Amino acid sequence: VFDGHASTPYTEEATPGPLNAYGRTKLAGEEEIAATGCHALIFRTAWLYSEFSGNFLKTMLRLTAEKEHINVVADQIGTPTYAGDLALALFSIIEGGYYAGREGIYHFTDEGARSWYDFAVEIARAAGHDTCRIEPCRTADYPTRAQRPAYSLLDKSKVRRTFGLEIPHWRESMLYCLMRLKKNN
């Protein structure tokens, strides 16, 4: 829901400025939920991946196994976030009954920051896909239908303070996800 022009992680109070239809529909959903007056927790997240379905991690595993060379965008910064970490956080909040009286918007991503390029290099290294050469490129060199924010870091102070969450680092979670993928294959 943000435009990506910030230089510090976005707080929940930062003014939204979606760059594409996806961001606009996410913001519209938040606004519709808030307008109902219901007691809701709205969680914003970014750069989700898991061992299921299509996502960046699984795409990089496939490409680095199949190709000798790929280019990956290096000028977009965010936090790779394992969907299992988000699910566990939501489960602990709901199961513990910690949400009563704490309605509102919260940010949740794993800890740390990377570019898509850095994340791709880490995925390939951890998976042993050393034969694929990964090179950085600019967003402008990799056109997509939807404009993407250059900076997607979310400030997690509020969710940590409100719910006492311990948030894992993205690298630990990536390794865990890769282990689960390997085990399931």
Locations of the language-model features?
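Conserved donor sugar-nucleotide recognition element shared by glycan-biosynthetic enzymes
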Residues: 22-26, 53, 79, 116, ...
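Mid/C-terminal beta-alpha module of Rossmann-like enzyme folds, strongest
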Residues: 89, 96-146
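Amphipathic terminal alpha-helices
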Residues: 170-185
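A hydrophobic C-terminal alpha-helical subdomain
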Residues: 140-162
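Catalytic helix-loop patch of NAD(P)-dependent Rossmann-fold dehydrogenases
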Residues: 1-43, 48
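Residue-level signal for the nucleotide or nucleotide-sugar donor/cofactor binding architecture
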Residues: 20, 78-81, 114, 154, ...
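A general structural signal for well-ordered alpha-helical segments in protein cores
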Residues: 56-58, 83, 87, 116-120, ...
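NAD(P)-dependent short-chain dehydrogenase/reductase
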Residues: 31-78, 84-92
